[in-house]
Amino acid sequence: MEFTKLSNRLDLVASFVPAGARLLDVGSDHAYLPIALLQEGKIEAAIAGEVVEGPYQSALQNVADNGLEDKIEVRLANGLAAFEPADGISCITIAGMGGRLIADILAAGLEKLANVSRLVLQPNNREDELRAWLVDHDFHIVDEAILVENEKFYESLVVEQGSQELTAKELRFGPYLMREQAPAFVQKWSKEVEKLAFALEQVPVENQSARASLEERISQIKEVLHVSK
């Protein structure tokens, strides 16, 4: 059997899935993630959820091609509608979507999450909005990681049940990411400083409020990166 090779960003998601988990992968596309995790023997079983017919059929085919029909059930469903409490799901992964959409998916199935011990979320934008939603709904970020793939930055959030308070700065930058200062984190926010500095150059001197706003954002990033002015 040929093992499924994950992209670096999905491999990062996989690394945070607990051993022995019963997994729901939302927006599973070709079911690459659950297939790889089962081939490694890391998880017990999985549901691959897809809301679009084409990727749903691709996932069905991939699961069959790998002989995993007894371990992975592919379901055509929207978000958390892909599982019921009786499925015994212990971990949910959601990757490849915006932070606001991930929050909407979680909100729509919030009552189903009581017995889910871990969420592994990889938004491709609006990470701060997702963190804010999680904090507002009594979820606790227990770890974070960041990588760059194909010139795009991906932040992964590892989330469990329990309340947590985060500052505005922690919501924006990530409590673990800003503390660990991984090379990809520094690269991401250094690029953001460059973009904001360019935008500042375009703002007329007389527009003091706009300039002050941009300068404040630049200053905050430099403070987090420990860069002198």
State where each predicted segment sits.
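Short alpha-helix immediately C-terminal to the canonical SAM-binding loop
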Residues: E53-Q57
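Conserved class I S-adenosyl-L-methionine
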Residues: G20-D29
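Conserved SAM-binding motif I beta-strand of class I
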Residues: A45-E50
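Class I S-adenosyl-L-methionine
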Residues: E2-L6, R100-K229
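S-adenosyl-L-methionine
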Residues: M1-G20, I35, L60-A86
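Short SAM/SAH-binding signature in class I
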Residues: G88-G96
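Conserved SAM-binding loop of SAM-dependent methyltransferases across substrates and taxa
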Residues: H30-I43
